[in-house]
Amino acid sequence: MINKIGVLTSGGDSPGMNAAIRSVVRAGLSEGLEIYGISDGYQGLYQDRMRKLDRYSVSDIINRGGTFLGSARFQEFREEAIRAIALNNMSKYGLGALVVIGGDGSYMGAKLLTEMGLPCIGLPGTIDNDVAGTDYTIGYFTALETVVEAIDRLRDTSTSHQRISIVEVMGRYCGDLTMAAAIAGGCEFIVLPEVEFQPEDLVYEIKASIAQGKKHAIVAITEYICNVFELALYIEKETGRETRATVLGHIQRGGNPVAYDRILASRMGAYSIELLLQGYRGRCVGVQNERLVHHDIADVIQNMKRPFRRDFLETARKLF
């Protein structure tokens, strides 16, 4: 029987992680469990940096961005000897299960620990919205608001100077954040990792819009597709229109979480406690059609593919 549970945040931070931690702690306490917070993700687990949390430990954090437990990337956790030390550290405190909040890399750590005998539940915490098994991840909607606000501001100056603006959005190899922000921000052009991209095709479309009288434009592009500063030089050379690139960077990860992320994180955190008490292990929580679901974490990592929102792309193309 599980009496004590650990909780950690791992990988890149996302707004709403604090709300998820708060939910895990308070839902666990309501079931008579003891909850321990682990600092700086799997690194803290390995370094034995854990502390007992009570309901006051998580007071006034639901509205705060980031993660008060801290987060880190710890590639060494792939090594079985490192994980064995982490498990031994957990046993010192009598921890019988672990809730992991993070992206697919964090899920991999939870999968490996489960295979070594520790029941783990994963919660999807990333602004990239690139985790399979869930419609939305914790932090995605807050990041979306941040990106749209940036696009709105870029539009003001692009209009004033009759300029082409390129805005690079996070997302790794998932275009959800870029696509949704482009629709909400009224971007004229969109470049996604899921769709083949040729710079000359983009230039052709920009020239066509200029020929139709368009004075300015905003191009939304997901990170890692190309060097956006080189792309800006190429567009300016080919079109004769001043072009500037803006990389939003880590500002997208910060800020107070919006209401939906707080609600989503709270629901998922409480659900993780339910699953552990019901005997589940090696599962990850998601929300699909607004209903909480859970999947085998190994299946999510290895087999499940996140569907591309082609309906969003079609909408975007009609409106641009």
Curated annotation (Swiss-Prot):
Its EC number is 2.7.1.11. The active site is at D128. The keyword Lipoprotein does not apply. PROSITE patterns: PHOSPHOFRUCTOKINASE. InterPro entries: ATP_PFK, ATP_PFK_prok-type, PFKA_ATP_prok, Phosphofructokinase_CS, Phosphofructokinase_dom, PKF_sf. ADP binds at residues 22-26, 55-60, 155, 186-188, 214-216. ATP binds at G12, R73, F74, G103, D104, G105, S106. It is found in: Cytoplasm. Pathway: Carbohydrate degradation; glycolysis; D-glyceraldehyde 3-phosphate and glycerone phosphate from D-glucose: step 3/4. SUPFAM superfamilies: Phosphofructokinase. GO terms for cellular component: 6-phosphofructokinase complex. It catalyses: beta-D-fructose 6-phosphate + ATP = beta-D-fructose 1,6-bisphosphate + ADP + H(+). The keyword Cytoplasm applies. Keywords: Allosteric enzyme, ATP-binding, Cytoplasm, Glycolysis, Kinase, Magnesium, Metal-binding, Nucleotide-binding, Transferase. One of its GO terms (biological process) is canonical glycolysis. Gene3D superfamilies: 3.40.50.450, Phosphofructokinase domain (3.40.50.460). Its cofactor is Mg(2+). Substrate binds at T126, I127, D128, R163, M170, G171, R172, E223, R244, H250, I251, Q252, R253. It holds the Pfam family PFK. Homotetramer. Catalyzes the phosphorylation of D-fructose 6-phosphate to fructose 1,6-bisphosphate by ATP, the first committing step of glycolysis. HAMAP family: Phosphofructokinase_I_B1. PANTHER family: ATP-DEPENDENT 6-PHOSPHOFRUCTOKINASE, PHOSPHOFRUCTOKINASE. Belongs to the phosphofructokinase type A (PFKA) family. ATP-dependent PFK group I subfamily. Prokaryotic clade 'B1' sub-subfamily. This is ATP-dependent 6-phosphofructokinase. The gene is pfkA.
